[in-house]
């Protein structure tokens, strides 16, 4: 009976996950002949080109890692007080969490495009600064849009409410008697937080960090809309190789490398 119940999900998993991954892995080795330029001969040339010195794609990967790390750290630091406030300070008003999340149920593209309107040369921010005579009308702040800063700002905005959830759950499950015991033993609020609350909520922090880092390292929609050439990321290169360049072997190499990195991170942080 158990085997019968598992057969459906297993077939689904093999057809729509394992098989596509194996196909992409085979393509990265040149084993599949799909286009006239494909040889169908197994070769590591694509991997050597990607991992070799001076590879623009490898450099782009590390650029994306730096940006994703920055976003993940900032988002985790900003989301922790939100989760702390909701879990330990306002237990009777947890509907605040719903109020925070509801605006983020709107279209992702609309929210990103809203930032584009706000940060443009004639957007809300520049117009306000011009109205306050902080900036001359003909000299807007150009780096507010189409830059690495813009990409990281928008990504942080998008992910903060969702990262607050695992932190909230972690803090909400804390044994309150431990906090009371620390207080009874004379520990200050700061010492109680540093010695009790923070260590016990560490799994939630790690989960929140990974929850942001893994998706953002391969992000391509946000850089495409608000990043320009400065905010171009690894995911954009991967997309361009498959769509514009039609270089599916190189695109498969980039995709498999990202999959290996993500799988490694999941294995590393899985114990949390």
Where are these regions (language model features)?
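Cytoplasmic-entry segments and transmembrane alpha-helices of multi-pass inner-membrane transporters
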Residues: 2-6, 82-118, 179-180, 193-194, ...
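Hydrophobic alpha-helical transmembrane segments of polytopic membrane proteins
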Residues: 9, 151-154, 210, 232-269
């Amino acid at each position: 009976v158990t085997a019968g119940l598992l057969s459906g999900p297993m077939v689904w998993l093999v057809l729509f996950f394992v098989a596509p991954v194996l196909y992409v892995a085979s393509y990265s080795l040149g084993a599949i002949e799909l286009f006239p330029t494909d040889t169908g001969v197994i070769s590591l040339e694509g991997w050597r080109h990607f991992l070799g010195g001076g590879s623009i794609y490898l450099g782009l990967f590390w650029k994306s890692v730096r940006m994703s790390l920055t976003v993940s750290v900032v988002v985790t630091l900003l989301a922790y007080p939100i989760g702390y406030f909701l879990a330990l300070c306002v237990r009777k008003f947890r509907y605040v969490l719903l109020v925070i999340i509801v605006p983020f149920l709107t279209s992702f593209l609309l929210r990103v495009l809203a930032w584009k309107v706000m940060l443009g040369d004639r957007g809300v921010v520049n117009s306000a600064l011009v109205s306050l005579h902080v900036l001359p009308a003909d000299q807007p702040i150009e780096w507010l849009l189409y830059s690495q800063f813009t990409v990281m700002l928008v990504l942080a905005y998008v992910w903060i409410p969702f990262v607050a959830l695992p932190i909230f759950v972690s803090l909400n499950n804390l044994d309150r008697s431990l906090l009371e015991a620390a207080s009874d033993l004379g520990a200050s609020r700061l010492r109680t937080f540093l010695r009790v609350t923070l260590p016990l909520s560490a799994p939630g922090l790690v989960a929140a960090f990974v929850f942001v880092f893994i998706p953002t390292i391969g992000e391509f929609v946000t850089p495409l809309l608000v990043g320009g050439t400065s905010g171009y990321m690894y995911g954009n290169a991967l997309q361009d190789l498959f769509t514009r360049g039609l270089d599916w072997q190189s695109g498969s190499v980039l995709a498999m490398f990202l999959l290996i990195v993500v799988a490694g991170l999941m294995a590393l942080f899985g114990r949390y």
